[in-house]
Amino acid sequence: MDNRQSQIPDHKSKDFLFLQLRDLPYFRAFLRAVESSYYQNLSLPAPVYDVGCGDGHFASLTFDQKIDVGLDPWHGPIHEAKKFGAYKSLVEADGAKSPFPSNHFASGFSNSVLEHIPHIDAVLKETARVLKKDAPFYFCVPNTRYLSELSISRVLGKGYTEWFRKISRVQHADEPEIWRERLERAGFNTEQHWHYFSPASMRVLEWGHYFGLPSVFARIFTGKWIISRTEWNLWLTKNYVSKYASPEPLEDGTFTFYIARKK
């Protein structure tokens, strides 16, 4: 078993940064663009299981083929996911109580979801149950540097760090050793991981929560995060964040991508 940081796929067939910027506030878009690129050369044999599919936006941009099943416990987002057409089937259910039989799916993924789940051990165990033996399971989560690299914490201290953790709903910002133990208990082997998203990128994301307020008002009044999705309108934003959207693995990256496999 190789748990060392590994090289990531290098696949640039799509301009994921522009595609994400068209629909999302920039501080979410440039992180999702990095993550979209990672899946391009990863094997996802069908049937595929997406744990925490949300509104389906990420899958609709990341994958050319429809994902077999998207599961999410939240009523609003999963019904919104229908409009993207990225899934063959959508299921509203808790990840700890999946309605599928054991050994059903040939692969699975969970993109930037597991860090938000309080009952993480139960969800991982249930995910392992519905995956076939040797099925790959891919996921990405923030690590400890997600919180330790916050710029405003240097002035306001731990109170701000805890506040930021709460507003971003992060329950688990842990290092690979912790995730490896969780996965082992649930029935997975951890094959590879890499850190990504530099501390500087994390600070751009942090400040984006405040500079991105106009997008919130646009969403409230128009139903869209971005009013004008044209390339010329997004050129300056893309030019600025592109230098922070590198997919290269970094020793001090603030997020971690994992490749696990069902035992």
Language-model-derived ranges and their functions:
Residues 1-101, 107-109, 250-257:
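Conserved N-terminal segment of class I S-adenosyl-L-methionine
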Residues 160-178:
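Acceptor-substrate binding/catalytic loop of class I
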Residues 179-194:
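A SAM-dependent methyltransferase catalytic signature shared across enzymes that methylate proteins
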Residues 138-161:
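Conserved class I S-adenosyl-L-methionine
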Residues 107-118:
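A short SAM/SAH-binding and catalytic strip from SAM-dependent methyltransferases
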Residues 121-136:
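A short glycine-rich, Lys/Arg-flanked "PGG" loop and its adjoining helix->strand segment in the class I
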Residues 154, 192-263:
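A C-terminal cap/extension of S-adenosyl-L-methionine-dependent methyltransferases
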Residues 117-122, 149:
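Short N-terminal helix/helix-N-cap motif within the alpha/beta-hydrolase-1
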